[in-house]
């Protein structure tokens, strides 16, 4: 069934946002809707269009106190085959089981609606609150992420903008809303390795140098290496080869080079420079003719127990009756950019079981629970 007009304010807004087909990096006026609501609530608005990406920064309050920022993204991933969806992915239907169905329901238009409604209610209830409530919203999280949160954070840093705490609305929950929050993420370091040999005929190997044979022992050593032991907050650093390419397509030609693409997901126990040096040492030990192009997607970050994590955890407990688990598992998020400001960052959002899948859906009532958790967190930190 379609969403009726008597839905809660959070669900009404979530449905409105989902019905806007904002496939990355297109915003489809989602931010226009959000800024209109925030402006009406008394927020100062600062749109930031950077290249082809829409972003905005909004604040309510004073500059002489702590800043709690809600961060998120209006862009969604492509739908995939439409014929595999039970309904149009941008219809925002609530089915007979009470599930809100649509692209972005979990990732992360539901969170956007919940944080906005919570903030509206908070500034109405506490117009003279401490510090500031802020929003940092982008339409470039699911794509390259060059001109979104990263670029906005650089602008905020350049003018010494204060940002003490940040709640990112990523879908952190696994089974029940609030059962897991992310208090950090591993770093991501990618690499493209080229091992050079000498092309030749397979019948005359003495006249060639086979880069596959040369590289195989080194790749095996890299895959078997224990990079670190992790710590109380992070698992050990992982190394994975994702692509391996060599050969001309002919069966009688020894290739001239081999290209391997690999990735580290690394903990705070390792550094970029340390990992790069250890890779170089292994490759040199095997006497390879090699070159690596490195690509750092983000450094690891960690928010240890403190004001933000305590406020979020106690709010989840008071609203749901459940203890939450703090975790650093999963991929990267825009939290990695915000953490560079020295900000305490926690990710809290809906259940993530169907994110990026066809028939993405969440329990509709979870968004009202999430709204209350966000509201209680605001009260604990800024009232």
Curated annotation (Swiss-Prot):
Signal peptide: none
Annotated catalysed reactions: N-succinyl-(2S,6S)-2,6-diaminopimelate + H2O = (2S,6S)-2,6-diaminopimelate + succinate
Binding site for Zn(2+) 2: 107, 142, 356
Annotated catalytic residues: 75, 141
Cofactors named for this entry: Zn(2+); Co(2+)
Keywords in alphabetical order: Amino-acid biosynthesis, Cobalt, Diaminopimelate biosynthesis, Hydrolase, Lysine biosynthesis, Metal-binding, Zinc
HAMAP family found in the cross-reference section: DapE (MF_01690)
E.C. number: 3.5.1.18
Pfam families membership: M20_dimer (PF07687), Peptidase_M20 (PF01546)
GO molecular function, a single term: cobalt ion binding
PANTHER family for the chain: ACETYLORNITHINE DEACETYLASE (PTHR43808), N-ACETYL-L-CITRULLINE DEACETYLASE (PTHR43808:SF31)
Cofactor, how bound (note): Binds 2 Zn(2+) or Co(2+) ions per subunit.
Assembly mode: Homodimer.
Record-given protein name: Succinyl-diaminopimelate desuccinylase
Family membership: Belongs to the peptidase M20A family. DapE subfamily.
Gene transcribed to yield this protein: dapE
Pathway: Amino-acid biosynthesis; L-lysine biosynthesis via DAP pathway; LL-2,6-diaminopimelate from (S)-tetrahydrodipicolinate (succinylase route): step 3/3
Organism: Pseudomonas syringae pv. syringae (strain B728a)
The UniProt record lists the keyword Hydrolase: yes
Gene Ontology annotations of biological process type: diaminopimelate biosynthetic process; L-arginine biosynthetic process; lysine biosynthetic process via diaminopimelate
Protein's job: Catalyzes the hydrolysis of N-succinyl-L,L-diaminopimelic acid (SDAP), forming succinate and LL-2,6-diaminopimelate (DAP), an intermediate involved in the bacterial biosynthesis of lysine and meso-diaminopimelic acid, an essential component of bacterial cell walls.
Residues annotated to bind Zn(2+) 1: 73, 107, 170
């Amino acid at each position: 069934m379609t969403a009726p007009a008597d839905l809660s304010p959070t669900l009404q807004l979530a449905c409105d946002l989902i019905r806007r087909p904002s496939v990355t990096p297109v915003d489809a006026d989602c931010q226009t809707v959000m800024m209109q609501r925030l402006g009406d609530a008394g927020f100062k608005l600062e749109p930031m269009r950077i290249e082809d990406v829409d972003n905005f920064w909004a604040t309510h309050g004073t500059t002489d106190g702590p800043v709690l920022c809600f961060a998120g993204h209006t862009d969604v991933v492509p739908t995939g085959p439409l014929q595999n969806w039970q309904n149009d992915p941008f219809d925002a239907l609530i089915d007979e089981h009470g599930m809100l169905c649509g692209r972005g329901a979990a990732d992360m238009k539901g969170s956007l609606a919940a944080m906005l409604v919570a903030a509206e209610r908070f500034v109405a209830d506490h117009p003279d609150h401490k510090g500031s409530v802020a929003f940092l919203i982008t339409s470039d999280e699911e794509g390259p992420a060059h001109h979104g949160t990263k670029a906005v954070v650089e602008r905020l840093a350049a003018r010494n903008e204060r940002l003490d705490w940040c709640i990112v609305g990523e879908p952190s929950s696994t089974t029940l809303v609030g059962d897991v929050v992310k208090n950090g993420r591993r770093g991501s370091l990618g690499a493209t390795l080229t091992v050079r040999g000498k092309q030749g005929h397979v019948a005359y190997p003495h006249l060639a140098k086979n880069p596959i044979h040369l590289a195989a022992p080194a790749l095996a050593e890299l895959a078997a290496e224990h990079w670190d032991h992790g710590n109380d907050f992070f698992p050990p650093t992982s190394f994975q080869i994702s692509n391996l390419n060599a050969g001309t397509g002919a069966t009688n030609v020894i290739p001239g080079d081999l290209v391997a693409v690999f990735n580290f997901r690394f903990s705070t126990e390792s550094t970029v420079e340390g990992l790069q040096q250890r890779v170089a040492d292994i490759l040199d030990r095997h006497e390879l003719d090699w070159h690596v192009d490195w690509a750092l997607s983000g450094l690891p970050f960690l928010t240890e127990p403190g004001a933000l994590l305590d406020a979020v955890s106690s709010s989840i407990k008071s609203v749901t009756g459940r203890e939450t688990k703090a975790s650093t598992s999963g991929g990267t998020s825009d939290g990695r950019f915000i953490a560079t400001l020295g900000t305490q960052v926690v990710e809290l959002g809906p259940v993530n079981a169907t994110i990026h899948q066809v028939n993405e859906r969440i329990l509709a009532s979870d968004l009202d629970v999430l709204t209350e958790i966000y509201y209680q967190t605001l009260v604990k930190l800024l009232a």
